[in-house]
Design a protein with these regions (language model features):
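Aromatic (tryptophan-biased) beta-strands that constitute blades/sheets of beta-rich domains
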Residues: 97-134, 151, 159-167, 198-204, ...
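Short loop/turn segments that connect beta-strands within beta-propeller blades
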Residues: 156-159, 192-196, 231-235, 274-278, ...
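Repeat-blade elements of multi-bladed beta-propeller folds
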Residues: 131-152, 166-189, 202-228, 241-271, ...
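Extended, low-complexity, intrinsically disordered tandem-repeat tracts enriched
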Residues: 3-18, 27, 34-35, 40, ...
């Protein structure tokens, strides 16, 4: 059984240190409060409700270990380089609006280098309030933070001041090659990433439901089975195909762009196409929607040259150059989320990690697909992959975070949030960060599972938190973007 890594938590006490009528909030013990951030210059006064705060326990504070509940999702700023989400390398990042219902996390993103030019020596946490709802995961490139709130907004990472916002509605966004690429559905446009100036805009033959950008190429998926590739600098159409899968036209299940290759699921086959020309490199049979149990095919190109695929209850290890099948693993239940890959030998925790919808976590040998161990958790409906970092595997199921030792497969701890966990956890510098539908951001000690700090916002957390250069960025349904010290929450540095 998993020991409980944290105490039962309830709503935090009233904000401390703010005079009546002041909309700033302060964590108990913090030197300075967080203000509401710069407001939109539209002449309207938006009421800002102070958030509640809960003091993080002292490191030495003992906590009772509770049994698991039966089934019912960095250093200081300017410190060591932060790795990408799920321990991946840096690169361009993407965020896409939900199609309806609960705001899900956006597609997997990877972080740019954390060095922020021009950051002042004395940095303060901040928050920025939007007029409209936020969705997805924030994106940081150089000294700007990009978020979508009906438009694309670019905020200065040091001060929280808005640099620019788009005049067009943007349901999806990708930042790459010095440009912000976005779509309002029937059209696609690009802006300068620094100044927001329009570079090009064009009409698309279909409704864009997914958008990714990399190495000068923009890849879109349109409703009705269309896939298009565009020149990032000019908007010229590079190639287009029809007949892609139409059962799962959602941002997370759309065509995937990775390292110069476009991966498309069509006619029961997984196609690997040259991203610039559309020429087929290889194809591999994975089955249509009925054959894979009514679940989308999930693809994870990996650093070892393989492409790992979850198709129904199967996990496939394919050769990245030829598409030849290296191995196949079958489980009793279907996989809803992509595989996760950790580089290195299995004896050091390397391999492929997957979790099925029953909540069983599998550690597979990347060379032959043999399962080294399997650990049951809770039934999960999350589309987010497990997270592997620093020899530990973190997986969310419902309102709980489970952490497992990657090598032996032994249960380390279970931490329960107040409601369903949103997005995926982020593990950086010995800490695990995640958001929840209980309106809270949580930061735990990654090894012990004890609560480092917790922030209650005015709404559900949306998407996956982002950690760059020791700063944690997150969005909430209270229409605020938060920039917090990853180690201390609202602690002051400088």
């Amino acid at each position: 059984p998993f020991p409980s890594g944290g105490p039962a938590v309830s709503g935090g006490p009233s904000p401390l240190g703010a005079p009546p009528g002041d909309d700033r909030v302060r964590l108990a013990g913090a030197q300075l409060p967080i203000g509401p951030g710069p407001r939109r210059s539209d002449g309207r006064q938006v009421a800002v409700r102070p958030a509640g705060w809960l003091r993080a326990p002292e490191p030495s504070a003992g906590r009772a270990l509770l049994p698991a509940v039966p089934p019912a999702p960095a250093g200081p700023p300017g410190g060591p380089a932060a790795r990408g989400v799920n321990g991946g390398p840096g690169g361009s990042a993407h965020v896409t609006a939900p199609s309806g219902g609960r705001t899900p996390g956006g597609p997997a993103v990877s972080e740019p280098p954390p060095h922020v030019p021009g950051r002042p020596e004395r940095w303060r946490p901040w928050r920025f309030r939007m007029t409209n709802d936020l969705w997805g995961t924030p994106v940081v490139v150089d000294d700007l933070l990009y978020v979508t709130s009906f438009e694309v907004h670019a905020l200065d990472v040091a001060s929280g001041k808005r640099r620019f916002k788009t005049s067009e509605v943007a349901w999806s966004m990708a930042v790459s090659s010095g440009r912000v690429h976005a779509s309002d559905g029937p059209s696609l446009f690009a802006l300068g990433a620094k100044d927001g100036a329009e570079r090009w805009k064009l009409a698309v033959d279909g409704w864009v439901y997914s958008l990714q950008a990399e190495r000068g190429t923009v890849l879109t998926g349109t409703r009705g089975g269309g896939v298009q590739a565009w020149e990032s600098a000019t908007g010229d159409l590079l190639w287009t195909i029809a007949g892609a899968q139409t059962d799962f036209e959602t941002p997370d299940a759309g065509p995937l762009l990775h390292d110069g290759t476009a991966y498309v699921w069509a006619d029961g086959q997984l196609y690997a196409l040259d991203a610039r020309t559309g020429v087929e490199r290889w194809r591999h049979p994975v089955g249509d929607s009925a054959a894979v149990g009514g679940t989308p095919v999930r693809v994870r190109p990996a650093e070892d040259g393989a492409v790992y695929v979850c198709a129904g209850s199967r996990v496939l290890g394919l050769d990245g150059n030829s598409g030849a099948e290296r191995w196949r693993f079958d489980s009793p239940a279907a996989f809803l989320s992509p595989p996760a890959f950790a580089p290195g030998p299995a004896i050091a925790g390397g391999g492929v990690y997957v979790a099925d919808y029953l909540g069983t976590v599998y550690a597979l040998d990347a060379t032959n697909g043999y399962d080294r161990w399997r650990v049951p958790t809770e039934a999960r409906s999350s589309i987010e992959p497990v997270v592997v970092a620093d020899g530990m595997v973190h997986v969310t199921s419902g309102n709980a975070l489970y952490t497992i030792d990657a090598v032996p497969g032994s249960a380390r701890y279970r931490f329960g949030a107040g409601a369903e966990i949103v997005g995926r956890p982020v593990s950086v510098d010995g800490r695990v960060h995640f958001g929840s539908a209980d309106n809270c951001l949580y930061t735990l000690d990654a090894v012990a599972g004890t609560l480092r700090w917790k922030l209650e916002t005015g709404g559900e957390i949306t998407g996956t938190p982002l950690v760059v250069g020791g700063v944690l960025y997150a969005s909430s349904k209270d229409r605020c973007v938060y920039a917090l010290d990853a180690a201390k929450g609202t602690g002051q540095h400088g």
